Amino acid sequence: MQDFQNYILGAWEKGKGTETKLYNAINGELLGGVSSAGIDYEAVLNYGRNVGGPALRKMTFQERGRMLKALAFYLLEKKDAYYNVSAWTGATKIDSWIDIEGGIGNLFANASLRKQFPDLPYYVDGVAAPLSKGGSFIGHHIMVPKEGVAIHINAFNFPIWGMLEKIAVNLMAGVPAIVKPSEYTCYLTEVMVKDIIASKILPEGALQLVCGLGRGIIDHVDARDTVTFTGSAATGKVLKGLPHITDRSVAFNLEADSLNASILGMHATPDTEEFSLFVKECVKEITIKAGQKCTAVRRIIVPENLIDDVQNAISSKLEKTKIGDPAVEGVRMGALASKLQVERVRESVLALEKSQNIVSGDLESFDVEGADKKLGAFFSPILFRNEDPFNNIACHDIEAFGPVSTIMPYKDMGEAIELAKMGKGSLVSSIVTPSNQEARDYVVGAASMHGRILVLNKDCAKESTGHGSPMPLLTHGGPGRAGGGEEMGGKRGVLHYLQRTAIQGHPTTITAITEQFQIGAEMPEANPHVFRKYFEELVVGETVFTHKHTVTDADIVNFANVSGDNFYAHMDATSLDGTIFEQRVAHGYFILSKAAGLFVDPKKGPVLLNYGLDDARFIKPVYPGATIGVRFTVKEKMDQEKRSEDDIAKGIVRFLVDVYDETGETVALATILTMVKKLDQSK
């Protein structure tokens, strides 16, 4: 018998004895045992805080992003081994793809977020707040990595995705993790973590693994730490309410299984493509991962005049679904994760059956391909029908965490929304309809009790990721029964692991802290011109003060002729009554164009190109006779990795373009983005 191990304190260790025996979900074969007994969790937490944390916090967001990208590519090369082990969980190839490659996709997605963060170990949040009349005192916000650990207590259904979707976020933020997968499928998590540790891509202490029961794993958490829990609502609420969690104000994110609903719109009649899409989506959500998904469709809400059509269509497809060993050709649904899960789902089905009828499937009589039904953890797809869902409410309270769903009728969209909300808070719902108005009515009406809503129609179906797939750049979580938590969500998720702190001081001081130029800070004159300097030589705040240009009527006419912009305010002085303008006004885009002519040093140098313009604002009208100049300031610098050995080493520099007139007042502001060559071409 194999003993599955924990990775703690920089070493692989077995726990004392055997807490749990693990079995192959397909054939019942004993795989081994696992234990976390004897682990000193206080030492484990301190190892993450004192070893992994400092190493991650020294890295910039750009470096952490590149680290995640490297890890993603590394794990993709190893994926075949994960598929082999994933089969032990009862998963089909498609199920495993969601878990393995879907999980790795989270690493890629979070790595790409580095473009949204500064080239710093911490994040500068929002814009400065002016706090004084003279401008010598301002406020801002920074967000620094929390100095604790992220403890992730995960469910059995996605041993890889469940880990990677969480650690991708905390690692990007600069926070180490301790992962506790479900003991029942921890063997798959262990295989991947062994590869992660062997790769040495993550700094030591950034990731630890506890494969056993993990009793005591959150006993020593404090305000620096974050606990995330994915699993049953009952267990999650107990953990979240522990006195030391509340007394120490420990951040706790709860993502619980929920009674998600899919709604067939009233316009999606059997002759529409949307009807077929709805049936296909419901069948998929019942059978993929054998229904063991926190986002699976548990309630199928359809117009009362279409309930028979929908029932017959779904039942027909479910009855044709082959159950068994995924290695056998034609098998479309594997096993539940364990015999224990079979018993739990069976109990829930029997409880539901007291108030509604099974119209497809059977608890006892079903065929299994290539395996022994008695040895494996197999379960038949079950479809219930509830004729009176407003009074027979068990379907809104009891979740059978397997291939089980209930179909129910509604009279109008108001009823459909009310039924969806009777789940008391869900991770996701979906509506399938060809009507945009119907979609809008549902989304606006149901959104308050749902974390995500999919609107599906024939126009997006080909590329839709489906009802049950949380996306790394969108939030995952939900109100009420779903736990009230939120994870992933791209940049939003990363911010959960950062502490926001308000800072106050002189603009020059705030510039030094944020490494972003703040209005009112010192502006030392650049010498030589900033376009003559390489990336490493540029200093935030240094400024080019340009020569001046007096705007003429000819400038306005010539720009109108070149651009084709003959808007009346620029060209017809007789049409200005009732406007804010005193006379014909120069084009805002002319002002910025002329500003470029003033601040650009035209000779070939380190500046490779200008690739964008952000935050352009035209603040004050410029009339013929006004004289403009430019304060051209290094606003922010961001390193950029080389894409290949032959690539030019470069960085991104953002310059503030402050155009002012003869009174000294700003007339236009913009930020230009440039690529600037580095002196050191080796990295």
Predicted regions and their residues:
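N-terminal Rossmann-like NAD(P)+-binding subdomain of aldehyde/semialdehyde dehydrogenases
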Residues: 1-135, 320, 337, 448
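Conserved C-terminal structural/oligomerization subdomain of aldehyde/semialdehyde dehydrogenase
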Residues: 26-33, 201-204, 223-224, 316-317, ...
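Short, well-ordered beta-strand elements within core beta-sheets of diverse protein domains
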Residues: 30-37, 52-57, 131, 151-152, ...
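Rossmann-like NAD(P) dinucleotide-binding subdomain of oxidoreductase/dehydrogenase enzymes
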Residues: 118-277, 410, 463, 485
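ALDH superfamily catalytic-core signature
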Residues: 195-200, 226, 235-390, 414, ...
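Catalytic strand-loop segment that frames the active site of acyl-thioester-processing enzymes
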Residues: 526-586, 678
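HotDog/MaoC-like acyl-thioester-processing domains
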Residues: 530-540, 618, 622-683
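Hydrophobic beta-strand-centered segment that forms part of the acyl-chain substrate-binding groove
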Residues: 577-636
